């Protein structure tokens, strides 16, 4: 049976790399993103499906997960990775006390509410073997000056993960790939394709994943 994986934020960066990694492992991928042309081109390349999705709109997220549930050999969704995220301002130079209300609201609506919507809409299409992999970062747990609303949103997303894990029969956890070289922050870091391998591994260890945060150290210890 082919695994069906839904990824938001798949138009580029880490989301695209995660979609590619799962497709390389034989999964059927359902791709959501705001850049319609980018996700449709990627879906054509990977043999998956794509739907223009703004995670701030729960109805668009609902449609993506419904499409994903019909994309594979069997109905349903096996894995969801809510990767869509935004960062308003310059990382390291975006203090919370200077953050505009509009920027704070958009960050939380995308990085927290978008995660909530993706998981909430995925669960009805999952059986008890389903897995939810929520990307996170160290700023969620270790305060760093200048990361403002982004850090707050990631901390809140980790809190949402723990509650979903307590409430749902599926394995729900966070994956921390460290700093990844994407356009989101422009800080350099690990190649997205390397970081994506951490997600495919995390999907294979649901007992270790559920309610936890899996990072590079866990992956390297398990795969060395």
Where are the regions that the model predicts?
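Conserved glycine-rich cofactor-binding loop
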Residues: 11-12
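Conserved glycine-rich Rossmann-like NAD(P)H-binding loop of the short-chain dehydrogenase/reductase
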Residues: 25-41
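The beta1-alpha1 cofactor-binding region of Rossmann-like NAD(H)/NADP(H)-dependent oxidoreductases
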Residues: 37, 51-66
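Amphipathic alpha-helical dimer-interface segment in Rossmann-like NAD(P)H-dependent oxidoreductases
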Residues: 66-73, 109-130
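Conserved mid-core segment of classical short-chain dehydrogenase/reductases
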Residues: 86-102, 146
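Catalytic Tyr-X3-Lys loop
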Residues: 97-116, 157
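Catalytic loop of short-chain dehydrogenase/reductase
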Residues: 128-156, 161-166
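C-terminal helical subdomain
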Residues: 170, 174-175, 186-224
């Amino acid at each position: 049976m082919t695994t069906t994986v839904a990824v938001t934020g798949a138009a580029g960066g880490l989301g695209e790399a995660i979609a590619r990694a799962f497709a390389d492992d034989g999964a059927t991928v359902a791709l959501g993103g705001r850049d319609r042309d980018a996700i449709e081109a990627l879906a054509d390349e990977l043999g998956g499906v794509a739907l223009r999705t703004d995670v701030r709109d729960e109805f668009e997220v609902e449609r993506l997960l419904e499409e994903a549930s019909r994309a594979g050999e069997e109905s349903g969704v096996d894995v969801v990775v809510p990767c869509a995220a935004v960062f308003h301002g310059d990382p390291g130079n975006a203090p919370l006390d200077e953050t505009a209300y509009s920027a704070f609201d958009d960050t939380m609506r995308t990085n927290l509410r978008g995660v909530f919507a993706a998981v909430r809409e995925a669960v009805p299409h999952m059986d008890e073997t389903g897995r939810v992999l929520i990307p996170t970062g160290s700023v969620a747990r270790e305060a760093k000056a200048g990361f403002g609303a982004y850090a707050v949103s990631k901390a809140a997303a980790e809190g949402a993960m723990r509650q979903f894990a307590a409430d749902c029969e599926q394995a729900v956890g966070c994956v921390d790939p460290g700093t990844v070289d994407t356009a989101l922050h422009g800080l350099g870091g690990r190649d997205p394709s390397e970081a994506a391998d951490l997600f495919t591994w995390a999907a294979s260890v649901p007992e270790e994943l559920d309610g936890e945060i899996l990072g590079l150290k866990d992956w390297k210890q398990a795969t060395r």
